Amino acid sequence: MHKQYHIAVLPGDGIGPEVMQEAYKILQVLREHFSLFIKTKEFDIGGIAIDNHGIALPKKTLIGCENSDAILLGSIGGKKWDTLPINERPERASLLPLRKHFNFFCNLRPSNLYKELNFLSPLRNDIVKHGFDILCVRELTGGIYFGKPRGRVTKKKLMYAFDTEIYYKFEIVRIAHLAFKLARSRKHKLCSIDKANVLESSILWREVVEEVSKEYPDVILSHLYIDNVCMQIIKDPNQFDVLLCSNLFGDIISDECAMITGSIGMLPSASLNEKNFGLYEPAGGSAPDIQGKNIANPIAQILSLSMLIRYSMNLNKIANKIDNAVINVLKKGYKTMDISKDQNYLKTNEMGDVIADFLKRDK
């Protein structure tokens, strides 16, 4: 008997509902041509949830996510809700509590530049002519974003603010094991990012990563300081495979890697907990300026679905087929507006149709 999977679908705001429709096309192909038993159920989140329920993360949505095997998210936010108090705005009032509720300790941000699209990168052609494939593994629950004490003080004419960078050994061990396992499934290379020449937390980070590495003798481990890796990624991104980062450094590096691909509309992301339950979403925003114009790139949403199938369902072969369908579509010259050199481009729904068609052929 085949396992039945349940996905909580959160289309959200902006272009989210549009690109989610294209992910549905891929799901339908998986049902009809690959005999996968996948059920989906939609729930409101973000701005649309505020409009419909008066709250960005309704209890019904949270319960729906709890009863699923994974969460597939579109996008959240828009100008319509920017006048709300900051803690009530869609992004902060929905994503942060959702991540906290499920204890997502790891963020995966792949940055792939396909050689067919190397003209999009701001880097020189001789650097990116073969494309690149980097996976940033970012620790999500520790570090300076959550460390205490933190605050701001004014004493007479003196004003200052302070934050605390703190990492517990178990947090580093947990994220390091995951990064090594991912490196083992790729090119067996892992680069750990720190600032161990200055920060005590980074000294511990490096010591613990070295300790964990003894369990993965087949993975080549290297260490770089955050300032150096920022330069090295620009100089030669192909030298890297998996990057292991703390919360702050991963925030910086993942955005740099995204920028040098030339189109964030191509990039998926995943947030995972210890049970491999995950939240999968495009790395870009809700893009309200192009909402409803049928020109958004659905590839990031489709690749987010691929990551869901890979990490939460453990169906690597199926995920590879989705990835290959995207690659083959690009090789054939099909492009959406954001990645096209000219006016000859596909609409959002057309790109979804083409990718679904290529996937059918790879049965």
UniProtKB/Swiss-Prot annotation:
The answer on whether this UniProt entry bears the keyword NAD reads: yes
For the ligand (substrate), the binding residues are 99, 109, 138, 227
Which keywords label this protein? Amino-acid biosynthesis, Branched-chain amino acid biosynthesis, Cytoplasm, Leucine biosynthesis, Magnesium, Manganese, Metal-binding, NAD, Oxidoreductase, Plasmid
Q: Where is the signal peptide?
A: none
Q: What class of enzyme is it?
A: oxidoreductase
The Gene Ontology biological process terms listed for this entry are: L-leucine biosynthetic process
The family database entries (InterPro entries) matched by this protein are listed as: IsoCit/isopropylmalate_DH_CS, IsoPropMal-DH-like_dom, Isopropylmalate_DH
- Any Pfam family: Iso_dh
Task: List its EC numbers.
Answer: 1.1.1.85
List, in alphabetical order, the Gene Ontology terms for molecular function in this entry.
3-isopropylmalate dehydrogenase activity; magnesium ion binding; NAD binding
Q: Which cofactor does it need?
A: Mg(2+); Mn(2+)
Where along this sequence does the record place binding of NAD(+)? 78-91, 285-297
**Note accompanying the cofactor annotation:** Binds 1 Mg(2+) or Mn(2+) ion per subunit.
| SUBUNIT field | Homodimer.
Q: Which family does it belong to?
A: Belongs to the isocitrate and isopropylmalate dehydrogenases family. LeuB type 1 subfamily.
What this protein is called in its record is: 3-isopropylmalate dehydrogenase
Protein source organism: Buchnera aphidicola subsp. Diuraphis noxia
